[in-house]
Amino acid sequence: MSLLTQIFGSRNQRLLKQYQKTVREINALEPAMEQLSDAALQAKTPEFKERLAKGEDIDSILPEAFAVCREASKRVLKMRHFDVQLIGGMTLHYGKIAEMGTGEGKTLMATLPTYLNALTGKGVHVVTVNDYLAQRDAEWMGTLYGWLGLSTGVNMSQIDHDAKQIAYNSDITYGTNNEFGFDYLRDNMVYDTADRVQRDLHFAVVDEVDSILIDEARTPLIISGQAENHTELYHKINAVPPLLTLQIGEETPDGKGTVEVPGDYTKDEKAHQVLLTEAGHEKAEQILTRMGLLPEGASLYDAANITLIHHLYAALRAHTLYHKDQHYVVQNDEVVIVDEFTGRLMTGRRWSDGLHQAVEAKEGVRIQNENQTLASITFQNYFRMYSKLAGMTGTADTEAYEFQEIYGLETVVIPQNRPNQRKDRQDQVYKSSEEKYGAMLKDIQDCYERGQPVLVGTTSIENSELLSGILNKANLPHNVLNAKQHAREAEIIAQAGRPKAITIATNMAGRGTDIVLGGNVAKQVQIIEANDALSEAEKTAQAQKLGDEWQSLHDQVVAAGGLHIIGTERHESRRVDNQLRGRAGRQGDPGSSRFYLSLDDALLRIFAGDRVRAIMDRLKMPEGEPIEAGIVSRSIESAQRKVEARNFDIRKQLLEYDDVANDQRKVIYQQRNELLETQDVSELITSLRQGVFADLFRTYVPEQSMEEQWDLKALDEILRNEWQIDFSLAAVLEAEPNITDEEMLERLLQVTDAAYEAKVAIVGRESFAGFERGVMLQSVDSNWREHLAALDHLRQGIHLRGYAQKNPKQEYKREAFELFGQMLNLIKDAVVKTVMTVRIQSREEIDAAEEQLAQAHVENVHYQHADFDPDAAPEELLAPTAQAHEAASQPQVNTMPKVGRNDPCPCGSGKKYKQCHGRLA
C-alpha cells in the first residue's frame, strides 16, 4: 500500500465514507417515515414526481426517496434495507458497479435506485440473465413498486407485441439482456413507428453484470434469415476429416519445435484453431478430387474453390474441437449449444460461419440452412447507448479494469453486512482424473455421513454425468443440475442447503437463487397461505411448525460446518471460481470450499501441466497422493491471469472492429427512423432522383469536356433500356447544335421529373408517398444486410494485411468506410430505379406493393446470440505481427493496383473481384 493510500485511503474507502454521510441522513429520516400512514407514505411518489417535473435535481431527493422505499419495503415485503444495501443503492444510482457478496440482498438493494430513477417517468430497465429470474424478481419486487404507485412490466421472448409495448411503457421493466438487445434490433427493422416497442434507453441496472457485460460480450446478438442451401456439400465434406491424421509437434522458426509424428493437420487447443499442413493440403485435394468436388489439377486455394476450403475447415473444427455433451448436446434431432459459462442449453442459438451445419453433419442430424445476418449488435455497444448504466454482482473486482476501460464503469466493493466465515482450503492436485474423483468421493462421503450439505461445481455436462455415475455406484443420493433440466434448477438449488444434500451443478447453473442452510421453506409457506380451506389460526400454526422444523435443520447444518463447496476443475476465469465459492458462507453463515484438480484438466494440461508434473516426478509422489502447495496454486492462478488477459484482448479487439460497424449502424438506424417519422418523402426522392440522373449524365458527358468526348448514344440506350425513359439527347444535340452540356442536363432532369409526376398522378400523392417510403426502407434494409456480409468477409481476411506492413485495423476502417459510401450510392440507385421503373395502373396495385414491401423482411427470421466462439482467438482480432504495429504510425497511402475482373479481390475475401467489391464498384 502506497503512503498516499495510507494517508487518504483508497478510492473505494473514500467513496464509502462519502456514501456513509448520506446513509446517516436516510437513517435520520426513518422515525418520521415510520409515523406516516400508508396513504401518506404512498402520496410521496406523486410528490417526488412533481418536484422533479419542476426542475429539482434527482440527487437532492435521494435521501428522502431511499427512506420512503425502505419504509415501504418494511411494510410490504417485511424486509428492511441494511445500511450496506443503502450504500449499494447509491453506487448503482451514480452509475457504478456494486460488488456485493452472495446472499447480501442484491435484489432488494436494486429497488432503491430503481424506484428513484423511475420517478422521472423515462423508464428503468432491470436486466437479468434468464427469464426465470426476470419473472421472479418482477413479481417479488413488483408488489413493492405497485404499492408505491409505480407500474412494473416483464419483457420475455414468448410474449406478444402488444404485451411488450405495455412492458416497456411501464415505469420499471424487468427482462433478459438478450431480449432487450433483440428488441432494439427489431425496432430498427419495423415499417411503421407504431410497431416499435422500446422507448429511449434511459437507465439500466444489470444484475450479474460480470456475466452479461464480460462473459457474453464476445458473442454478438444476431437476427438472421436463411441463405442458400449447402446441405449436400456439408454431408460430402463430413467424410473428409476422419481420413486426415493429427500431426503431433510443430516446427518453429527458432528450431526449438520439431514434428514428432507427421500428420495432415495441427490442432491448437489454446487458440481453438485447426490448420492443414502442406501434406494435409495435398491429401485433402486428392480426396476432394476423388469425390468429384474439386476439378482435376485444381487447388483448394483457387478463387473458385474458396467455399470448399471454408467448408473443409468448418468440418475439421467440428470433428476435432467440438465435443458432444461438452460443447453441445443432441436433442430432438437437433444440435443444441451448451453455454460454456453456465452449462445451460442455449436453445435456438447457432454457431455461425457454417460450423453449426458441420457439427450437424458430424452427428447425422438434419442440417438446417445457413443464415444471412439481417441485423446485429454486441452487448458492449447496446449497453453503452443507455444514458446511465449500473450493475451489481458478487464478483466484479477481478474485472474492474475492463469495466472501466470498455464501459467507463467504476467498481465499488460494498462491505459485508456480516463478516465472511467461509474457509477456502488449498487446492489438491492429483496426477490423474481417476485419483482426483476418488479423493472427491471420499470428501463427499465424509460430508454425507456428518450431515453436511455439499455443492459440487463441474465445468461440463459430461463431467457432471461422470460424477453422478460415481456417486450412484457408491449409493449416495444426489441431484444433478445441468443444462439438460434447468427448468428445475432454482427449486433444486433452493434445497441444496438441507442436511446430507448432495447437489452437482454445471458451473453457475441456478445462479441468482440463494442456498439457505437447512433448506428453503418459503415456497411451502406460500402454499399454506394460499390454501383457502385453512383458517388463519391453522395457517399460522402450520407455518410456525415449518419454521421450527427449519430451525432444527438449520442448526444441524451449521453444527456440521455449513455448505461445503467442491470444485472439480479450475475455470479459465478466476471470477467463475470465486462465484462457485461464493455460494457458501452467505450472510455470515459458516461454510468451506476446496478445488480438486488433476493434470488431465484442460487448464492445467494447456498452461501449467508440464511444470506441475515435473514437480510431482521430482518429489516421487506415490499414486493417489495430492500436491497441496502454494506454488501449484500460484501456477494455476498465473495461467488463469494469462487466459483472462487474452480474453480481454479479444473482447477489446472485437469492440474496436465492431465500433466501425456501430458508427455506420447509428447512421443507418437514424436515417431509417427519420424515414419512418416522415409522412411525405417526395422531396427526398426528388433530391435523390436528380442526383442519380446527374451522376449518370456526367458518366457519359464529363464536365468541361469537348463534344467529341460525349457518348450520347450509349446514354440514350441506358435511359431507354434501364430506366424506361424514351428520350434522346443525341436528337436534342442534332436539333440544337449550340446547346451546352448544362442545358442538356437541365433538359434531362425536366423529362425525368415529368415521368415521375405522371406516375404520382395515377394514384395520388398520398398513396404514392407510402409506397415510396416502403421502397426506401426496403432498399436500406436489403443493402444494409449485404453490407454486413461484406464487412464480415472483409474482417475475415484483414489480418493478412499485417504481413504487408499495414495496420489491419486502419485498413479495416478505411475499406469499411469505402464500402459504406458504395452502399449509400447503391441505396440511392435502387430507390430511384424502383420508383422510376415501377408500372402502376391503379391505387389497389400500389397498396398491394406497399403491403408486400412491409412483409418482405419478416420471413424465416432467426434470433441468435451467435457464438462468436470466444475460445477461438481469431487471427483477425489478435494483433497480427510486430510489423503491423510499426505500420500504424505510417501515413496511409493508396497503393492499390488496377484489379482485373477475374483477379482475386484485394479486400482479402478470396472471391473474384467481380463477385466482391467489383460488384459494388
UniProtKB/Swiss-Prot annotation:
Catalysed reaction, written as an equation: ATP + H2O + cellular proteinSide 1 = ADP + phosphate + cellular proteinSide 2
Compartmental location: Cell inner membrane; Cytoplasm
Transmembrane segments: none
Residues engaged in binding ATP: 85, 103-107, 514
UniProt EC number: 7.4.2.8
Membrane topology qualifier: Peripheral membrane protein
Positions that bind Zn(2+): 905, 907, 916-917
GO biological process, one term: protein targeting
Record's cofactor remark: May bind 1 zinc ion per subunit.
Alphabetical list of Pfam families matching this protein: P-loop_SecA, SEC-C, SecA_DEAD, SecA_PP_bind, SecA_SW
Gene Ontology MF annotations: ATP binding; metal ion binding; protein-exporting ATPase activity
Cofactor: Zn(2+)
Keywords, comma-separated and alphabetical: ATP-binding, Cell inner membrane, Cell membrane, Cytoplasm, Membrane, Metal-binding, Nucleotide-binding, Protein transport, Translocase, Translocation, Transport, Zinc
Record GO cellular component, one term: plasma membrane
InterPro entries per UniProt: Helicase_ATP-bd (IPR014001), Helicase_C-like (IPR001650), P-loop_NTPase (IPR027417), SEC_C_motif (IPR004027), SecA (IPR000185), SecA_CS (IPR020937), SecA_DEAD (IPR011115), SecA_motor_DEAD (IPR014018)
EC class: translocase
Family according to the record: Belongs to the SecA family.
PANTHER family on file: CHLOROPLAST PROTEIN-TRANSPORTING ATPASE (PTHR30612:SF0), SECA INNER MEMBRANE COMPONENT OF SEC PROTEIN SECRETION SYSTEM (PTHR30612)
Subunit structure: Monomer and homodimer. Part of the essential Sec protein translocation apparatus which comprises SecA, SecYEG and auxiliary proteins SecDF-YajC and YidC.
Function: Part of the Sec protein translocase complex. Interacts with the SecYEG preprotein conducting channel. Has a central role in coupling the hydrolysis of ATP to the transfer of proteins into and across the cell membrane, serving both as a receptor for the preprotein-SecB complex and as an ATP-driven molecular motor driving the stepwise translocation of polypeptide chains across the membrane.
Protein name: Protein translocase subunit SecA
